[in-house]
Amino acid sequence: MLRIAGRRASSLSRWPVRSVAPSSSAFISANHFSSDDDSSSPRSISPSLASVFLHHTRGFSSNSVSHAHDMGLVPDLPPTVAAIKNPTSKIVYDEHNHERYPPGDPSKRAFAYFVLTGGRFVYASLVRLLILKFVLSMSASKDVLALASLEVDLSSIEPGTTVTVKWRGKPVFIRRRTEDDINLANSVDLGSLRDPQQDAERVKSPEWLVVIGVCTHLGCIPLPNAGDFGGWFCPCHGSHYDISGRIRKGPAPYNLEVPTYSFLEENKLLIG
């Protein structure tokens, strides 16, 4: 073993010696190459050999944590690299980047609260308006409501006459019946009717008859105070209706339709 070490030392002594600047970041202490034994010991290394070894060692050194760093052959790591390679649970803050802002002026807090509260009320009002606008947009317009119902004044209608009004695009017959008309309507045998229906089922007041003026056959408009039964006559196909609007003769299959209506007052009628 001693012979092998001597041969290696003699081969290293032949390498050219390069001067090392004293300002180099890497410095090798003599303690790493000296021994308690005398200089004649094979383990002692001359300063020139140390410089050569340093030169070749620096070519493979880095700033990472390694065995060479433990031997003092490389300088200390930068703080950032050392923190990354040696993590710790201790948190150290940079006081320069984490400075606390000074507390605000207490006299201005009331103004800030007022502004924030006022903004909330404004936002709530806007949301309320949007909701109301959406709900109201779903309701029917005034034109549609006007067409949905019709108010009629009955005071100008004479007994025994018929008035025609327009409701939802259809004609409506309003007849003020006399006592003879009422008695005639109640004297009809229901068994002889194509669409059996009592007169009391078709009127809310015996004096007033309200029916839609559209023939139930093909949609023609019957003529009032005409026909074989004193009611209405359809000139299109010859259907005859009595004084209660019931079909008595002709091709029409059903009686004249009775719309939804009510009496607001004695002489006020609301259709629809």
Curated annotation (Swiss-Prot):
Which is one Pfam family of this protein? Answer: Rieske
Membrane recorded as keyword: yes
Could you share any additional remarks the record makes about this protein? The Rieske protein is a high potential 2Fe-2S protein.
Binding positions ([2Fe-2S] cluster) = 215, 217, 234, 237
For this entry, the transit peptide stretch runs: 1-60
Name assigned to this protein: Cytochrome b-c1 complex subunit Rieske-2, mitochondrial
The top of its lineage is: Eukaryota, Viridiplantae, Streptophyta, Embryophyta, Tracheophyta
Bilayer-crossing regions: 110-132
